[in-house]
Amino acid sequence: APDLITKLNHNLPFAINPPAIDNDYPQSRIFAVFQFMTKEVFIVAAARTPMGSFNGALSSVPATQLGAIAIKGALEKAGIDPNLVNEVFMGCVLQAGVGQAPARQASKFAGIGDHVPATTINKVCASGLKSVALGAQSIMLGLNDIVVAGGMENMSLTPHYLPNSRTGYRYGHVQALDGIVQDGLTDAYDKSLMGTCAELCAKEMNFSREEQDNYAIQSYT
């Protein structure tokens, strides 16, 4: 173990001080605690597309293209060359019909090179913010210097599903599942709708509708 500590200290930019070994317990081992000096993280620019209505003016634009527009806009505002981006995290919940690797598509359409890792995050409503958190953490740990993080969605292009189409339909009516309801707005366990969850949260936290509306207005003013 001392040789291992010496070797690690030789190769790492910080020293490891091993804790004392409890000789009363033969199974005890040395546990090295790595203390990283984390970097500060800054959001240097942000961009978004207009918030379109359902089946509105932007309804025919795929989520990946919307994401690309926002990525390109943010990079231009920050004055950052797309080739300097180290990694991309993009949230996307309704991925059916979008195509493989949505984050990769948005990244590529925005002019970021194929050599840059791009990861799609699905944490339902928190997908975009989780992407930002993952990007920040990667910078804090020294894994990246420049990260693109955000979210993209087009509910209007989300398809309906025919679950039994591969085995064939015979006699009778065929029921289609709405991809928005199935994968985006329904709890997978108790089948409650997300709108219900929002109402319960507002009631529990004592948020009035006026307060919610005023907060929402801040996002586009």
Question: Where are the model-predicted features located?
Answer:
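Intrinsically disordered, low-complexity polar regions and short flexible loop motifs
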Residues: 44
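Short hydrophobic targeting helices and cationic amphipathic motifs
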Residues: 4, 10-12
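Short glycine-rich phosphate-binding loop at a beta-alpha junction
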Residues: 86-91
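Short, positively charged and aromatic/hydrophobic N-terminal segments
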Residues: 13, 20-33
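Short polar catalytic/cofactor-binding loops
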Residues: 47-51
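Intrinsically disordered, low-complexity serine/threonine-rich segments
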Residues: 17, 31-34, 85, 128
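Acyl-thioester C-C bond-transforming condensing/cleaving domain
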Residues: 38-39, 53-84, 96-101, 107-221
